[in-house]
Amino acid sequence: MIHGTKVLKEGFAKMTKGGVIMDVVNAEQAAIAEDAGAVSVMALERVPSDIRKAGGVARMADPSKVIEIMDAVDIPVMAKVRIGHFVEAQVLQSLGVDMIDESEVLTQADEDFHIDKEQFTIPFVCGARDLGEALRRVDEGAAMIRTKGEAGTGNVVEAVRHMRTIQGAIREIENKTEEELWQVAREINAPRELVKLTAEKGRIPVVNFSAGGIATPADAALMMQLGADGVFVGSGIFKSENPELVAKAVVEATAHYEDADLIADVSTDLGAAMPGIDINEIPEEERLQNRGNLI
């Protein structure tokens, strides 16, 4: 197998910085996302809110669905695989997608291992709730991290929690000695070289987007102000009353996240946002964010 270089994979991820990646389930939605200014689309059969409602086992999208969406747009297309399901990843690579999301939104396939992402030519994005989780995924070859949030809820609280957790951990290690960093590496179960690099850079070594519960332009701007390099929006666009308007507004708010006047303007008369779920109504064992966090 010919391996894509680490530089090329991370370079692709950096090209999406400052942008919005939108979940789409068909060619029509993909075209709406592209017209709104999305930097990429995520091809899947059901958005996270529908996956949550349906229950059962959620798997990689049918290849015909992925191809339909790839043929509909000129922007990069991503697709999800189950955690640890390297054959689903092989299939998506064969189809020619631009990036693979090893995602907790789908049912976990392997409770002991994530995919060895260095065995693939295309880049991967993975979710994380804390610094240790993020750096373990980077060590496996992830070219992008996204804070997990709680997908399919329309509730940004967990996305905020995870971004603050990661950013806070980075601030704590920035001025530590090398010996102290080794201790941190042991405590968070992460490679010490990556812990040291994170302390030196003042950020995790790859692009870090936010995901899970972003439903409004203000949500997107909030995550950017908290330190995200960009945002994933799953159910928030196409479960809203006016997807075309919301998609454009989220893109504008993400690009101009410090301009309150602009955010107010694009947030006006959008219609109803997607229905939300109080995180306290979701039992701990049913929270998607918990999938893969112990690996």
Swiss-Prot record:
Superkingdom of origin organism: Archaea
EC number assigned by the record: 4.3.3.6
Catalysed reaction equations from the record: aldehydo-D-ribose 5-phosphate + D-glyceraldehyde 3-phosphate + L-glutamine = pyridoxal 5'-phosphate + L-glutamate + phosphate + 3 H2O + H(+)
Record Pfam families: SOR_SNZ (PF01680)
Active site: K80
UniProt binding sites for D-glyceraldehyde 3-phosphate: R164
GO MF, any single term: pyridoxal 5'-phosphate synthase (glutamine hydrolysing) activity
Keywords associated with the record: Lyase, Pyridoxal phosphate, Schiff base
Residues binding D-ribose 5-phosphate: D23, G152, G213, G234, S235
Xref: Gene3D superfamilies: Aldolase class I (3.20.20.70)
Pathway the protein contributes to: Cofactor biosynthesis; pyridoxal 5'-phosphate biosynthesis
SS bond partners: none
InterPro entries documented for this protein: Aldolase_TIM, PdxS/SNZ, PdxS/SNZ_N, RibuloseP-bd_barrel
GO terms (BP aspect): amino acid metabolic process; pyridoxal phosphate biosynthetic process; pyridoxine biosynthetic process
HAMAP family: PdxS
NCBIfam families, A to Z: PRK04180.1, pyridoxal 5'-phosphate synthase lyase subunit PdxS
Similarity section: Belongs to the PdxS/SNZ family.
Assembly with partners or alone: In the presence of PdxT, forms a dodecamer of heterodimers.
Function, as annotated: Catalyzes the formation of pyridoxal 5'-phosphate from ribose 5-phosphate (RBP), glyceraldehyde 3-phosphate (G3P) and ammonia. The ammonia is provided by the PdxT subunit. Can also use ribulose 5-phosphate and dihydroxyacetone phosphate as substrates, resulting from enzyme-catalyzed isomerization of RBP and G3P, respectively.
Protein name stated in the entry: Pyridoxal 5'-phosphate synthase subunit PdxS
Organism expressing this protein natively: Methanosphaera stadtmanae (strain ATCC 43021 / DSM 3091 / JCM 11832 / MCB-3)
Organism lineage: Archaea, Methanobacteriati, Methanobacteriota, Methanomada group, Methanobacteria
Gene: pdxS
